[in-house]
Curated annotation (Swiss-Prot):
Family recorded in the similarity comment: Belongs to the bacterial ribosomal protein bL34 family.
Gene3D superfamilies registered for this protein in UniProt: 1.10.287.3980
UniProt keyword Ribonucleoprotein present: yes
Gene: rpmH
Organism whose genome encodes this protein: Rhizorhabdus wittichii (strain DSM 6014 / CCUG 31198 / JCM 15750 / NBRC 105917 / EY 4224 / RW1)
GO CC entries: ribonucleoprotein complex; ribosome
This protein's name: Large ribosomal subunit protein bL34
Segments for region (Disordered): 1-44
Length: 44
């Protein structure tokens, strides 16, 4: 059986990166919440 986590930095950035978060209203909400919480890293 193939394992579920097959690491790839490209896919990681595309799916969870800053630009993909900024692209949708929900993603911007996520960034705002993480800023409000004082997270050092906002996205992958």
């Amino acid at each position: 059986m193939k394992r579920t986590f097959q690491p790839s930095n490209l896919v990681r950035k595309r799916r969870h990166g800053f630009r993909s978060r900024s692209a949708t209203p929900g993603g911007r909400k996520v960034l705002a919440a993480r800023r409000a919480r004082g997270r050092k890293k906002l996205s992958a």
